[in-house]
């Protein structure tokens, strides 16, 4: 059933939520601030579809922001969760399934020798950074503008005015002293990285980078960038932390690293797919590093719900069913949809570029660059065209990410019927994008 204008149920739910939840949402991007309008409140999902409080069904291209690679409510995952829940929701003790999941990850990603389970991607990256600082005894961290690694204080930093300038707080509540320990550099710029290492090398503990940027839209690394980044970090005695929270086990059985081999990260953060839609994440790496985590070593990390048995069951079931056929289907659907959107926009004269990293894709609207490589280039786009495109698709029954800075996510459950519904909606949405006019300034909202 195609969507129509926003209904009373969604409006009522949003109003009710705003009275008791800050902004009416529990993660900012859900509020539709980047695209305008009233957010949909979802009540049911199955396969490639999701249903809102009005009972309207949408083809879902958000997929819970990535975890649902098999589709919503996959029978094997649901069954595994039900069986685990029947045995107990949480024990506060170790379980055999934790070891099974660690073994499954290590089998897929050979540079991971040991794995620690946590509950969120933020915890995973935060722990990786603490490990790097504990191992090297150094305070500083390099990250890239536009890369998102969760909401821990040291990662909510923005670039200062100069190349080697210590960074500024990126959120109220983050102290200048904390932000000053993070050096924010332009992505895909090895020269900038080398310059900062030359100036601050003895104090830099690690470089943290998304394996492929997917939180400023999709911006893949330049060919050889991740390998060169690793070599450069090691040259100065620093570590490379690869953030695969979003890409891990989504773009291949070994994450984006599986598509971009030729280097060995020191630490890696996983999330989303590893939990199959449940709150679960992990940090992994070589044993020499992982063994300084408590209780084996002096770097502290703990969590009451770390390795929650229900979440672990969902993750194990998801990984068990995410084989070659699933990734082949994801690639086919991503290729079909990204090409179709591009064709529709081209037909209406809308300048754009298609951005892909494996089966992740997004679009940059406007004549920005043939293939934007940095956050600064991505920010120059005509986001007002995406707002119009987004709402036209939503009205036609297709749920897209409510921000031009987010990747589109497909699932193995997106069959020809679901893909066909998306294709049918594209011409009108492209016309809406073509006729859109600039409005309020571009708003960048992290999820």
Swiss-Prot record:
GO terms for biological process: protoporphyrinogen IX biosynthetic process. GO terms for cellular component: cytoplasm. NCBIfam families: hemL, PRK00062.1. It comes from the Bacteria. This is Glutamate-1-semialdehyde 2,1-aminomutase. Homodimer. The gene is hemL. It is found in: Cytoplasm. HAMAP family: HemL_aminotrans_3. PANTHER family: GLUTAMATE-1-SEMIALDEHYDE 2,1-AMINOMUTASE, GLUTAMATE-1-SEMIALDEHYDE 2,1-AMINOMUTASE 1, CHLOROPLASTIC-RELATED. Keywords: Cytoplasm, Isomerase, Porphyrin biosynthesis, Pyridoxal phosphate. InterPro entries: 4pyrrol_synth_GluAld_NH2Trfase, Aminotrans_3, Aminotrans_3_PPA_site, PyrdxlP-dep_Trfase, PyrdxlP-dep_Trfase_major, PyrdxlP-dep_Trfase_small. Pfam families: Aminotran_3. GO terms for molecular function: glutamate-1-semialdehyde 2,1-aminomutase activity; pyridoxal phosphate binding; transaminase activity. It catalyses: (S)-4-amino-5-oxopentanoate = 5-aminolevulinate. Pathway: Porphyrin-containing compound metabolism; protoporphyrin-IX biosynthesis; 5-aminolevulinate from L-glutamyl-tRNA(Glu): step 2/2. Its main location: cytoplasm. Its cofactor is pyridoxal 5'-phosphate. The modification N6-(pyridoxal phosphate)lysine is found at residue 272. Belongs to the class-III pyridoxal-phosphate-dependent aminotransferase family. HemL subfamily. Its EC number is 5.4.3.8.
